[in-house]
Each structure stands twice: as C-alpha cells, then as structure tokens.
Amino acid sequence: MPRSCYSRSGTLLLALLLQISMEVRGWCLESSQCQDLTTERHLLECLRACKPDLSAETPVFPGGADEQTPTESPRKYVTGHFRWGRFGRGNSSGASQKREEEAAAADPGFHGDGVEPGLREDKRSYSMEHFRWGKPVGKKRRPVKVYANGAEEESAEAFPLEFKRELTGERPAAAPGPDGLGFGLVAEAEAEAAAAEKKDAAEKKDDGSYRMEHFRWGTPRKGKRYGGFMTSEKSQTPLVTLFKNAIVKNAHKKGQ
C-alpha cells in the first residue's frame, strides 16, 4: 500500500515535469530513461535526466513573445556602445569598483594592480620626497644652549635657579697673560678710568650749565657770533625810539 501511494505521487510529479519539459524540450520524453515508467527505479532515472534540462533553461513566462524578458546577448548588444557596457580598467562599472574596494578593505595586503604595499609606500615616498609635506613629520629639534662658562653648562641641571643666578653674576678668575699681568687687573684699571671720567663730568656739570654743543641750540647766540663785529649798535635801538627821533628832527626843521 505505501509503495502504490508513492508510485502514484511519483507518477503525478513526473507527469507535471514531463509536461513542462515538453514545452521546453520535447526530446526529454524520447530519452532512454523515460521509455519504461512502470518501476520506481526507472521513474527516478527519468526525473534525474529531465531535471538538468529544466534548470538550464530560462523560466517560461505567460504571454506573447514581445512580453518575454530579453536574453543576455541582445542586452549586451544594445548597451555595448555605452561607456558602462564595456569592460576594462578605465571603463569598469561602479559595482565592480565597489567590489574591488570591498575586497581591498577585507584584505589589507591586496591591491588592484597586484603591487605589494611595501613597494607602494617606497615608491610614494620616493616620488614625494622633494615636497615639504612628503617628508615624515619628526620631532622639532630644540637649539642647543651654549654657555660662556663651562661650570654653568655642567650645572644647568644639577643646581637650582638661585645657584644659577649666583653663577651668572660671578666672573671667571683672572688668568695670567703672556706679560705676567692678569686680565682681572686690566679690567679693574678700565673700571677705575671709567669712574674717573664720570667724576670729572659731574664736576664740570656742577661748575656751570651743561651745553649741548652737538645740537643746534647749543651754539652761542647770534649776537655773540664772530665776536659781535657783524652787528651794529644802531640795530639794538628800539623802533619806537627811531620814529620819535625822526619826528623831532622834522619838527625842528620846520620851526627853523
């Protein structure tokens, strides 16, 4: 009883598949596997023989021939003259580029041109080494401080700030020169001479008013230039006095 039910269901399934296969390919029934359908083994062999033929074909849609979906070859023929229908590195589609980018992101060592990442980095650094931004950014070098005294350089880190100030205030000891005198004595003599000059200048300032001879207003007055012989005494008379004298002379002449 179970075998008869199985055979009936298998027969119905085979009939359905055969009907579809007849529409797709009529020679499926003419094969040797589908000649004898009485046994279960022959039925399964016929199903296996017709199944690859059905899967290889495109699905059949109802309607006329003009309503069927176009095949791949006419589609390629229609879009072949467009830029996105061509194959190539420069004219590849956006989907292929996206797939390449995803593959590159998944595999860090993969590049589309097949070049190893180490070689690419070397080439990039070589081609951009003449640019300022192509050089690696390193730590800025600080200028080296040069001290006049060797003790200050040695004690720059060992002594605190107060000791540094004391060291900067002190001067190195006088070293004996080739003539037997120390540089310290020469410095003391120069300091004494400068102090004497300052003292003399202060005394001169106390004696009289300080004249700024190097300025224009430090020169003697106009009346004192050239010993005073260029100016006449009449010019010193006021103008009002001259007018009075002239009026008196005119009145005296008229009275005569």
Swiss-Prot record:
Question: Where are the Phosphoserine residues found in this chain?
Answer: 155
Q: Which organism is it from?
A: Cavia porcellus (Guinea pig)
The record's family statement is:
Belongs to the POMC family.
Q: Tell me which residues are glycosylated.
A: 71, 91
Q: What does this protein do?
A: ACTH stimulates the adrenal glands to release cortisol.
S-S pairs? 28-50
| GO-annotated molecular function | G protein-coupled receptor binding; hormone activity
Q: Where in the cell is it found?
A: Secreted
Phenylalanine amide modified-residue sites: 87
- Tell me what PTMs the record reports for this protein: Specific enzymatic cleavages at paired basic residues yield the different active peptides.
A cellular component term, taken from the record's GO annotations: extracellular space
Renumbered to this chain, region (Disordered) spans 88-120
Picking any one GO biological process from the record gives:
neuropeptide signaling pathway
Q: What is its main location?
A: secreted
The protein, known as: Pro-opiomelanocortin
Which residues belong to the signal peptide in this entry?
Answer: 1-26
**Tissue expression, per UniProt?**
ACTH and MSH are produced by the pituitary gland.
One Pfam annotation reads Op_neuropeptide
Q: Which UniProt keywords apply?
A: Acetylation, Amidation, Cleavage on pair of basic residues, Disulfide bond, Endorphin, Glycoprotein, Hormone, Phosphoprotein, Secreted, Signal
